[in-house]
Curated annotation (Swiss-Prot):
Disruption phenotype: Cells lacking this gene are unable to utilize rhamnose as a source of carbon. The keyword Transcription regulation does not apply. This is L-Rhamnulokinase. ATP binds at A13, S14, S15, G16, R17, T259, Q304, G402. It catalyses: L-rhamnulose + ATP = L-rhamnulose 1-phosphate + ADP + H(+). Keywords: ATP-binding, Disulfide bond, Kinase, Magnesium, Nucleotide-binding, Rhamnose metabolism, Transferase. The keyword ATP-binding applies. Monomer. The lineage of its organism: Bacteria, Pseudomonadati, Pseudomonadota, Gammaproteobacteria, Enterobacterales. Its cofactor is Mg(2+). Optimum pH is 8.5. GO terms for cellular component: cytosol. It can also use manganese, cobalt, iron, calcium and copper ions.
Length: 489
């Protein structure tokens, strides 16, 4: 038997993991083993909301060292993270300023300013990226306006996965899929857009030309002295998750479900017409030149905050209690920007219901029911928008990522959307990360080849829509007339 051992470092907004993948060439089987899992979260520092990148780096190194201590020879390493955030470095590679998180309020008002000064359509035609108030475009503008004293010291700006790869290898890289989330990459040239960079106040010299997934950035020297290639995978975690989505045919849509919910489809061409602009559709970069035509949905962030505020540790028990409640008594729009980072999520949800003359969710189960029903209804809205955009309905929806373990939400999604839902794999970002590594090692031909491996090895569960469910009746009778507010558009 011929084996490959690849390590995926997968960092999310709430947690991170170092995973070891073992690929057997002859039987084309792939197994994952968790080596190290650790928490991630927002911190308050000098008036900013920040990430603790030093702690994350220590956790990454701890996980890698654990693999080496087992005597396993690693063939390659890949790192994926969330998008838009960055770390600034000086000429010596030392950090400049703080690693500010996208949920910080420093960008307030800057998106509207950009649209007024540059033109909303022009920005969209250049980047193809949706308007979100925390995009890197506005973060850099906030930096240059609010902290001009830092500018003379900045030599490089690295997005999060590129920063951690740099810390392992000493080599800098700007990976394409994550770079597109910045709203600074020109959709026609796949390079940084000079007009958008100029408005942001950033110097183009801070960035290198984006590279597509599959190149070796450099090498990490393990404690035993071996040089291990660090591969530029599809380093935006959603891009990796889509690679591992076992999409079958052109009528399959995906939903990457986690802190954020990203719903979309793959396309060989971007959608940047007026319909796409009005719907705030994004065209993020994917592997092999494909576009991830998708829409951001606030996702399980709302639930994560409720769990934290209410100190709930038993999620299965909460879901069980939630399932016993009637559907659609409390409906909010999860994409309202009031939910980006409120002081207390529970109070914000209750206020939204009060302002719309609905019953007020009081118990933990009622709050969760409100979130699940509202997400499922928004999923139905977005799926309909995407189908209209491309002029063809979808036949099935693949839900991947940690959120696909929520069987109640999966069934609500199937019922609200009226479509077959296939849930899994859970560790989609990790698997997609591994997939690019295996292609770089010449073990697999392309993304479609890798998806065949995923389809035969992953644990997938099908949810069939129930047209007689409460939420299906709600969609048919009431929800179809509802207008949903765009997320920060």
């Amino acid at each position: 038997m011929t084996f490959r051992n690849c390590v995926a470092v997968d960092l999310g907004a709430s947690s991170g993991r170092v995973m070891l993948a073992r690929y057997e060439r002859e039987c084309r089987s792939l197994t994952l083993r968790e080596i190290h899992r650790f928490n991630n979260g927002l911190h308050s520092q000098n008036g900013y909301v920040t990430w603790d990148v030093d702690s994350l780096e220590s956790a990454i190194r701890l996980g890698l060292n654990k693999v080496c201590e087992e005597g396993i020879r690693i063939d390659s390493i890949g790192i994926d993270t969330w998008g838009v955030d960055f770390v600034l470095l000086d000429q010596q590679g030392q950090r400049v300023g703080l690693p500010v998180a996208y949920r910080d309020s420093r960008t307030n008002g800057l998106m509207a300013q950009a649209q007024q000064q540059l033109g909303k359509r022009d920005i969209y035609q250049r980047s193809g990226i949706q308007f979100l108030p925390f995009n890197t475009l506005y973060q850099l503008r906030a930096l240059t306006e609010q902290q001009p004293e830092l500018i003379p010291h900045i030599a490089h700006a690295l997005l999060m996965p590129d920063y951690f790869s740099y810390r392992l290898t000493g080599k800098m890289n700007w990976e394409y899929t994550n770079a597109t989330t910045t709203q600074l990459v020109n959709i026609n040239s796949d390079d940084w857009d000079e007009s958008l960079l100029a408005w942001s106040g950033a110097n183009k010299a801070w960035f290198g030309r984006p590279t597509h997934p599959g190149n070796v950035i450099g090498h990490w020297i393990c404690p035993q002295g071996n040089e291990i290639p660090v591969v530029a995978v599809a380093s935006h975690d959603t891009a990796s998750a889509v690679i591992a989505s076992p999409l079958n045919g052109s009528r399959a849509a995906y939903l990457s479900s986690g802190t954020w919910s990203l719903m979309g489809f793959e396309s060989q061409t971007p959608f940047t017409n007026d319909t796409a602009l009005a719907a705030n559709i994004t065209n993020e970069g994917g592997a092999e030149g494909r576009y991830r035509v998708l829409k951001n949905i606030m996702g399980l962030w709302l639930l994560q905050r409720v769990l934290q505020e209410q100190q709930i540790n038993d999620l299965p028990a909460l879901i069980s209690a939630t399932q016993a409640l009637p559907a659609c008594r409390f409906i909010i729009n999860p994409n309202d920007d009031r939910f980006i980072n409120p002081e207390t999520m529970c109070s914000e949800i209750q206020a939204a219901c009060r302002e719309t003359a609905q019953p007020i969710p009081e118990s933990d189960a009622e709050l969760a029911r409100c979130i699940f029903d509202s997400l499922a209804l928004l999923y139905a809205d977005v799926l309909h928008e995407l189908a209209q955009l491309r002029g063809e309905d979808f036949s099935q929806l693949h839900i991947v990522g940690g959120g696909c373990q929520n069987t109640l939400l999966n069934q609500l999604c199937a019922d609200a959307c009226g479509i077959r839902v296939i849930a899994g794999p859970v560790e989609a970002s990790t698997l997609g990360n591994i997939g690019i590594q295996l292609m770089t090692l010449d073990e697999l031909n392309n993304v479609d080849d890798f998806r065949q491996v995923v389809s035969t090895t992953a644990n997938l569960t099908t949810f069939t829509p129930n047209p007689d469910s409460e939420i299906a009746h709600y969609v048919a009778q009431i929800h179809s007339t509802r207008q949903t507010k765009e997320l920060c558009a």
